[in-house]
Curated annotation (Swiss-Prot):
Organism of origin: Mus musculus (Mouse)
Protein known as: Transmembrane protein 176B
Presence of the UniProt keyword Phosphoprotein in the record: yes
UniProt GO cellular component terms: nuclear membrane
GO BP terms in the entry: dendritic cell differentiation; negative regulation of dendritic cell differentiation
Localisation: Nucleus membrane
Annotated keywords: Differentiation, Membrane, Nucleus, Phosphoprotein, Transmembrane, Transmembrane helix
Gene inactivation effect: Mice exhibit abnormal development of the cerebellum and severe ataxia.
Length: 263
């Protein structure tokens, strides 16, 4: 304000003159770069689940699957030292063990990364592990039923029977007789021990396949529950953000403006 003195009828009167005032109003709007970064962040949030704490129970199930797969492959190698059975013919110990190892690795990777794609791949591997382990269990049970049957034992122990001397004029083969009964008894004892060992390997493989099914089902249940919980959490966060935006609307402006006003 500027003061001046004015004389009115011989009386000095102080008068004031208004001074121009400038008021600057700034309206800020996000730049194009900020909007681009926000869009990239939204896309990344859509493609991945929100971060959560690591479930060590899920990790332990993954490690258990890997160990069961290794044991299955080792038992498959041992089975090839025995008589030929369905387990050896189909090689179920190897493909069921390999799928179990892959499922365990997929579970561990998903628990570390916690992504949507890794979760779907992990669930598919777990389903494949359940299917292969179930097929191997069926083959193992059929093999056990056959190995515990009486005709199978008679066929195996017939190799220890004493050979009778005979001459076949058509083929010219000769079989020599062995009168020592103790050798026959000793052969049957060793053969019985080997058959029991082979039967134990088959039982262990069947049990391992059953354990693979149990562990895979448990891991699949935990994975589905975790995925459902994370999706619900993401929906709740989006709803909360929407409520906040509705409560505090942002002003719409084409660009940053500076409006001078003179009073």
């Amino acid at each position: 304000m500027v003061q001046s003195t004015v004389t009115v009828n011989g009386v000095k009167v102080a008068s004031t003159h208004p001074q121009s005032a400038h008021i600057s109003i700034h309206i800020h709007q996000k730049s194009a770069l900020e909007q681009l970064l926000g869009a990239v962040g939204s896309l990344k949030k859509f493609l991945s689940w929100p971060q959560a704490r690591i479930h060590y129970g899920q990790l332990s199930l993954g490690v258990t699957q890997i160990l069961l797969g290794l044991v299955s492959c080792a038992l498959g190698v041992c089975l090839y030292f025995g008589p030929w059975t369905e387990l050896c013919a189909f090689g179920c110990a190897f493909w069921s063990g390999s799928v179990a190892i892959l499922a365990g690795v997929g579970t561990i990777v998903h628990e570390k990364r916690q992504g949507k794609l890794s979760g779907q791949v992990s669930c598919l591997l777990l389903l494949a592990c359940i299917a292969t382990a179930a097929a191997a269990t069926v083959l193992g049970v059929n093999s056990l039923i056959r190995q515990t049957s009486v005709p199978y034992y008679v066929e195996i122990f017939s190799t220890c029977n004493p050979l009778q001397s005979s001459m076949d004029p058509g083929y010219g083969t000769v079989r020599y007789s062995d009168d020592s009964d103790w050798k026959t008894e000793r052969c049957r004892e060793y053969l019985n021990m080997m058959m029991n060992l082979f039967l134990a390997f088959c039982i262990m493989l069947t049990v391992v396949c059953i354990l693979e099914i149990v562990v895979s089902v448990a891991s699949l249940g935990l994975s589905l529950r975790s995925m459902y919980g994370r999706s619900s959490q993401a929906l709740n966060e989006e709803e909360s953000e929407r409520k906040l935006l509705d409560g505090h609307p942002a002003p719409a402006s084409p660009a940053k403006e500076k409006i001078p006003a003179i009073l």
